Amino acid sequence: MERIYLDHAATSPMDERVLEQMIPHFSGSFGNPSSIHSFGRESRKWVDEARAQIAAEIGAAEQEIIFTSGGTEADNLAIMGTALARKDLGRHIITTKIEHHAVLHTCEKLEGDGFDITYLDVDQNGRVSAKQVKEALRDDTILVTVMYGNNEVGTVQPIEEIGELLKEHKAYFHTDAVQAFGLLPIDVKNSHIDLLSVSGHKLNGPKGTGFLYASKDVKLSPLLFGGEQERKRRAGTENVPGIVGLKEAIKLSSEERDEKNEKYQSFKAIFADTLRDAGVAFEVNGDKEHSLPHVLNLYFPGVSVEALLVNLDMAGVAVSSGSACTAGSVLPSHVLTAMFGEESDRLTSSIRISFGLGNTAEQVKTAAKHVADVVKRLT
């Protein structure tokens, strides 16, 4: 039985070309990048090269890239680091109700520490507006954090509009771009973004890698203490193989962005058309106009999502009910709850399909046929 992986928004397989670049550095470039001898200088060269390439990709300066262990750490450093560094200027933070839990739980922690958090509502497409942000801004607002593209329903937020609004305000603008990076072109200067989080394993790079872009004008308090790595902002010996892999994954995603976007959009159409041809009733969750190309969230009226997922897994098709970080949770999706309310049937009858490396049109059609068969059997 062929297994079909359509859960790339949870994690993506590593591109073999990325692995090829990493392998020599597991044993070859083993020197500590902070050491002044030749072994250390060799490792430092690879780290600096990666930093320069990644910075250029988003229109940043090299010193504005902080390597992290992934998106969660990058989000924590952006939010906690800002809160600790700017608490004397204010204790108000604005975010949305559909953020990744790396953002939401960090904000909840700060609430317990005396910070005031405003959680913006979203419309039924999962979108906020710059107007909402403007209305929520206060003199003591020190940070606005709005994700670039949602990991569950794929809705893309009006980042440039929000950035334009905030450029004259003292509040820093952070965006969790983990799901969007590599598929949407991002220029931090043109979008007036102060802080941006990225994870390697969502773009066919290695797990345990990522970075935080922090504008040179941003002041952050470090969360890790020890050495003076990353310009004293993130202590710990650099993961040279991982950083090399992250650099290569970002390079490939940039070179192949247009091709992937076109392919994934066609996959969405194939999936939906196959369901329609089979006579299956469904609706799309999320904004159809402002959407990530690889994420498709579907609502099947009257179908138990648990039964659907189990049956699909038995058929060799891997999809999900939402964020992998809430797998096994008895609570419904906080994203769908924010969009449709606590009583909506969509909370218990929706699945997320997400496309990526290795998927073919034939696989997508086969998976959609399996979904149609299971839905018919369950209704």
Swiss-Prot record:
Question: What molecular functions are annotated in GO for this chain?
Answer: cysteine desulfurase activity; iron-sulfur cluster binding; metal ion binding
One of this protein's Pfam families, by short name? Aminotran_5
Top-rank EC class of the record's enzyme: transferase
| Assigned keywords, A-Z | Iron, Iron-sulfur, Metal-binding, Pyridoxal phosphate, Transferase
Cofactors (names): pyridoxal 5'-phosphate
User: Which reaction does this chain catalyze?
Assistant: (sulfur carrier)-H + L-cysteine = (sulfur carrier)-SH + L-alanine
- The modified positions for N6-(pyridoxal phosphate)lysine read K202
Q: Which residues form the active site?
A: C325
Query: Binding positions for pyridoxal 5'-phosphate?
Result: G71, T72, N151, Q179, S199, G200, H201, T237
Please tell me whether the keyword Chaperone is annotated for this protein.
no
* Record-annotated disulphide pairs: none
- Is Iron-sulfur included in the keywords of this UniProt record? yes
Q: What is its EC number?
A: 2.8.1.7
Q: What positions does the entry give for [2Fe-2S] cluster binding?
A: C325
Entry superkingdom: Bacteria
The cross-references to InterPro entries, in alphabetical order and at most eight, read: Aminotrans_V_dom, Aminotrans_V_PyrdxlP_BS, Cysteine_dSase, PyrdxlP-dep_Trfase, PyrdxlP-dep_Trfase_major, PyrdxlP-dep_Trfase_small
Q: What does this protein do?
A: Catalyzes the removal of elemental sulfur from cysteine to produce alanine.
**Similarity annotation:** Belongs to the class-V pyridoxal-phosphate-dependent aminotransferase family. NifS/IscS subfamily.
| Descriptive protein name | Putative cysteine desulfurase IscS 1
Which species?
Answer: Bacillus subtilis (strain 168)
